[in-house]
A protein has these predicted regions:
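Flexible, glycine/threonine- and acidic-rich loop/arm segments that mediate assembly and lattice contacts
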Residues: 1-40
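Helix N-cap / beta->alpha transition motif
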Residues: 7, 44, 113-116
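Flexible, active-site-adjacent loop/turn segments at secondary-structure boundaries
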Residues: 9, 50, 56, 102
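Residues in flexible loops and secondary-structure boundaries
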Residues: 12-14, 19, 42, 66, ...
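General N-terminal targeting signals
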Residues: 21-23, 28, 44, 123, ...
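Short, glycine/acidic-rich hinge or "gate" loops at secondary-structure transitions
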Residues: 36-55
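Sequence/fold signature of self-assembling virion shell proteins
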Residues: 59-98, 105-110, 116-171
Length: 171
């Protein structure tokens, strides 16, 4: 637990008000920082480390299902954020099934990225034309509204090339 104390001498010299205000702001800033770091921790450890109720890390290719199968919420081989990998993720999410193997028709909502990927995300999600080609092709990700809420930059993600799609699946 963080805190601060004011000396009796500071109180006697009437420095309490100026010191208290400065220290209180610093303490609030430290608390806000800690909350952000702890909040990002689940994504920073999504591929290794903390396991959950099914014995798997958050992003795994082998989440066990009741019917004996497994469900994957990540590609078999990690991939950088680009048009192909994002389209593949959108398609994979659309094919997710429930515990009984029934299609749940899930959709991506928002892309979460570290600051290093913000320009890539802008090109992928906000341009009219297809990225990296001189052809006059439409940007299918943008045109189809594949990621309707766009992207959010999380400054507390520690892996500069990790990216995550939030979906409409409730649990």
């Amino acid at each position: 637990a963080m805190g601060f104390s004011i000396t009796e001498e500071a109180i006697e010299d009437n420095l309490y008000d100026s010191l208290s205000s400065r220290y209180t702001k610093a303490l609030a800033r430290a608390m806000a920082y800690t909350k952000q770091v702890k909040g990002a921790d689940i994504l920073n450890n999504a591929f290794a480390g903390t396991t959950f109720g099914d014995g798997q890390v958050l992003c795994s290719t082998a989440h066990p299902l009741v019917n004996g199968g497994v469900n994957s919420n990540r590609p078999a081989v990690g991939s950088d954020l680009n048009e192909t990998s994002l389209e593949a993720a959108v398609i994979q999410i659309a094919g997710w099934t429930d515990e009984r193997g029934l299609l749940i028709a899930s959709k991506p909502k928002k892309l979460v990225i570290p600051p290093a990927l913000q320009f890539v995300a802008t090109r992928l999600l906000e341009t009219e034309g297809r990225v990296g080609t001189a052809d006059n092709d439409l940007n299918a990700l943008n045109n189809n509204g594949s990621v309707p809420q766009g992207y959010a930059v999380n400054h507390y993600l520690t892996d500069t090339d990790a990216w995550f799609l939030c979906t409409d699946v409730p649990n």
